[in-house]
Amino acid sequence: YALAAAVNGEVFRDDEGIFTKYREILQAYYPKAVWYRKIAQTCGLFSQSGQYNLPRMRRRGQFVSAELAKVECMKHAMKLYYLLNRTYAPHDKWLFKGLPENPLMTVDHTNVTELIEKISLLPADRAHEQELTTAIESLAVIFANELEKQDIIGQCDLYLDACTKELAAKSDAL
């Protein structure tokens, strides 16, 4: 979130231009290799928390752990949204509020915000298992399609962790 703070807002005074110079470098966003690595990491964490741990914890009756996995899944979904929009993510408390302000994704941002809001309102219990799974898988579809549309990777599996190897290889090739 420090990078988001550094590039947003207004600089009131920088007589020597030192901060402005660094700020312009930061505004160019992450180098492509770093960007690919961050996308790979975030895809993996989204899958781990929402597509793997959440269903496991529910099946085991560990609903507090399931809620934690659900929250982590939402957090990583929002961070992935920022990455795909080439925008630094703000502090966690501002992640959701900033989502509509990111126009670069080819999908309508309202789909993403509505799904995240829906996930946040659903309890991570057995009674809502299908509804929660469907919402998380819908996010995975949106992100997989976006990764393909932006030509970041070839064909993306809906289990986003499967995309991490290709992203890491692209990062290493740069």
Locate the predicted segments by residue.
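Long, low-complexity C-terminal extensions of enzymes
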Residues: 36-39, 118-174
